[in-house]
Amino acid sequence: DVLGSRGLGDVYKRQVHKDMYSFVRGYEFIGVDSFRKAQPREHAYAAITAFHLYGWYRDNHFCGRCGKPLKHDDKQRMLRCACCKNMVFPKICPAVIVAVTDKDRILLTKYAGRTYRNYALIAGFTEIGETTEETVSREVMEEVGVKVKNITYYKSQPWGLSGSQLLGYFCELDGDDTITLEEDELSVGTWVKADDIDVIDDHISLTREMIEKFRSEHVSHN
């Protein structure tokens, strides 16, 4: 949990135990996922980035090469080992979000075993030696068992909750539309027509932005 004001405008950037600050009036503990809906949007991003940095600092007290303590660099956002000169930069994991489309349909999924229950898009991390376009094809095949073509980059988004840089892609179904779920990852995978997609007011999620972009461009206007 992160300690923040009731208005979410003031964020304390260290993760703490609830009992330590239970006496502070005017504050309450909230889960970091609360920042998905926080406004203004730039404050929400600042809080999520603070959480990302906290995790990096927490996990990097000592040099992974020689074991000596790391120190903050004076000029860069970097940790430096004075002994062996090793430089440690914030961990940022590239990942893709994929909107698979078939004319007026889009492939929507739901995660298995997670608290987030809304529809989402296929997503996954890029492997070493892999282009992000290759990640798109691999993740789609692994999670829902279909092939894709015409992979097109949309936009990116930093996402500190998972320490990621998210890269959004649109692509088209290539062949058979039969879905074979990877049940360890997903509980639902289904084709949904643009007319059947609900408009959700979500100002921070790249996933929701991509779903809404597809819906608005393909919904019938009869």
Q: What does each of the following model-derived ranges do?
A:
Residues 50-59, 70-75:
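Short, flexible, mixed-charge glycine/proline-rich loop motifs
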